[in-house]
């Protein structure tokens, strides 16, 4: 549902807009108690069984947008409970990052194969013959699946000549490539933090908007209000994210208008990272010191490797991620600035909270959250005309935003600066496929390879914090790549 302007996205956007307005207008945070009535007006529910439930859900969304955790559902409480703790101009984060709002969950049934009304009770009944657990029988003249015996292999569905067997899927669980979505005592979805790698795919695939992440936009705006020098570093996926008329130069001008002191392309850090990883590959993999090299720019991919495949930790590149490399570059000229990563990625919020990174990056917001900030300041790119040149990076770094772009950039650097070096590359996208690739690498099937992993199917342009359809985003990124030079220069690696 990414890129489709559904009611779920409309509510999320409105929440971010209102929180941003509270920040810019420096309103009393106790007034947040009134917002559910402004966002959900009237007396009749539109999407739920009760307008009171709709407002309660909005209240929980407001808390998450302030960086706070959900309130307990079984105790009397207020939206603004402990609000003073988040009323600061520094990064505020209460784990976990992603949470299921219990009152918003539809309690969708778990995965199962179901016989539909198209079943003809045919003589061949191939479904019964292929079932490895003998879970299918005839009942009242039709096929019947015993869910207690079924192992959900799907063989029956494949062989039914009438297409009468369908797969029921729980959208959030189906989108999760690591099996982190479980079920609580009431049949609602819950996220197992020990399994989750914070890609956010469950969030964007829930049709009821029951899963949300925490935001830092209020604290960011408060820092601006206090006079801090705040620099935005834009992830390569930013082009096209704010509409067809929002050119890179207009986006930079708009960012300056809403309070940022300067704007950088994170592709600058990606250019440096591509060179560094090219060097790493040539010196370590091409010489046989390492069996393979895994890219490290996608935090969900890196987290997957470290959490599920600790044996490959040494093969994960130790090059600075583009976010960190760009933040360091920006601090060379502005050592006292607060650095804000603006990108498509939910997991970057966790990366920036790590002990080794938190001093480099002060805030992380998504394109979706930035759109809410633009709304709060009434920036409409259909009529906005200001421009400021934004042309910091080369094509290799800009291409990091699309799947295979990272490996392609590194290979381009190897071909350019280490001619004659043979390089084998592979890439995967989506956590389920990433797990398969790591299993292959672990078992020795990827010797000599440079392997790029992207947690989101499609790459960064398909991240949970994006605003437009993936295909449109890919087109815009590739166009922006062509507008730059093809390769980075060696001196870029100083960052």
What is each residue range found by the language model?
Residues 1-73, 213-495:
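Iron-sulfur-associated redox domains of electron-transfer enzymes in respiratory
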Residues 54-90, 97-98, 108, 122:
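Core subunits and conserved enzymes of cellular information-processing
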Residues 87-116, 133-134:
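N-terminal [4Fe-4S]-dependent radical SAM core
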Residues 98, 102-112, 122-127, 153-156, ...:
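Cysteine-cluster motifs in flexible loop/terminal segments that predominantly coordinate metals
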Residues 115, 146, 192, 234-235, ...:
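A secondary-structure boundary/capping signal
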Residues 124-147, 155-192, 197, 201-216:
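Iron-sulfur cluster-binding cysteine motifs and their immediate structural context
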């Amino acid at each position: 549902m990414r890129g489709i302007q559904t009611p779920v996205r409309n509510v999320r956007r409105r929440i971010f807009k209102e929180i941003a307005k509270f920040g810019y207008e420096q309103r009393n945070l106790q007034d947040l108690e009134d917002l559910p009535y402004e966002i959900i007006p009237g007396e009749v529910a539109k999407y739920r069984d009760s307008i009171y439930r709709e407002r309660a859900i909005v209240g929980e969304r407001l808390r998450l947008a302030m960086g706070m955790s959900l309130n307990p559902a079984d105790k009397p409480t207020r939206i603004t409970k402990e609000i003073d703790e988040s009323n600061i101009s520094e990064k505020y984060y209460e784990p976990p990052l992603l949470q299921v709002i219990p009152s918003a969950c539809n309690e969708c049934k778990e995965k199962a194969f179901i016989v539909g009304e198209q079943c003809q009770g045919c003589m061949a009944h191939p479904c019964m013959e292929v079932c490895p657990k003998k879970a299918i029988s005839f009942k009242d003249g039709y096929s019947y699946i015993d869910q207690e015996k079924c192992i959900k292999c799907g063989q029956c569905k494949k062989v039914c000549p009438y297409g009468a067997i369908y797969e029921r899927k729980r959208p959030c669980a189906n989108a999760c490539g690591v099996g982190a979505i479980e079920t609580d005592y009431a049949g609602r979805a819950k996220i197992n933090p020990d399994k989750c790698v914070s890609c956010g795919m469950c969030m964007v695939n829930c049709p009821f908007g029951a899963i949300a992440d925490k935001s830092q936009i209020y604290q960011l705006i408060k820092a601006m209000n206090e006079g801090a020098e705040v620099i935005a570093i834009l992830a390569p996926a930013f082009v096209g994210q704010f509409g067809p008329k929002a050119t890179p130069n207009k986006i930079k001008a708009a960012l300056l208008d809403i309070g940022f002191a300067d704007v950088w392309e994170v592709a600058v850090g990606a250019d440096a990272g591509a060179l560094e990883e090219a060097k790493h590959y040539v010196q370590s993999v091409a010489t046989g010191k390492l069996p393979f090299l895994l890219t490290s720019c996608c935090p969900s991919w890196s987290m997957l490797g470290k959490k599920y495949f600790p044996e490959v930790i040494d093969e994960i590149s130790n090059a600075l991620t583009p976010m960190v490399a760009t933040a360091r570059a920006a601090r060379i000229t502005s050592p006292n600035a607060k650095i804000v990563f603006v990108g498509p990625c939910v997991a970057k919020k966790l990366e920036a909270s790590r002990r080794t990174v938190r001093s480099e990056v002060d805030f992380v917001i998504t394109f979706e959250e930035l759109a809410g900030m633009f709304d709060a300041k009434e920036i409409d790119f259909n009529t906005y005309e200001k421009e400021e040149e934004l042309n910091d990076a080369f094509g290799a770094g800009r291409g990091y935003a699309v799947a295979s772009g990272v490996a392609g950039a590194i290979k381009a650097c190897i071909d350019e600066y280490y001619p004659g070096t043979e390089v084998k590359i592979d890439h995967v996208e989506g956590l389920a496929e990433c797990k398969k690739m790591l299993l292959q690498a672990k078992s020795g099937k990827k010797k000599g390879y440079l392997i790029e992993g992207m947690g989101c199917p499609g790459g960064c342009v398909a991240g949970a914090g994006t605003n437009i359809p993936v295909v449109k985003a890919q087109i815009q990124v590739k166009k922006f790549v062509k507008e730059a030079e093809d390769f980075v220069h060696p001196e870029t690696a100083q960052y």
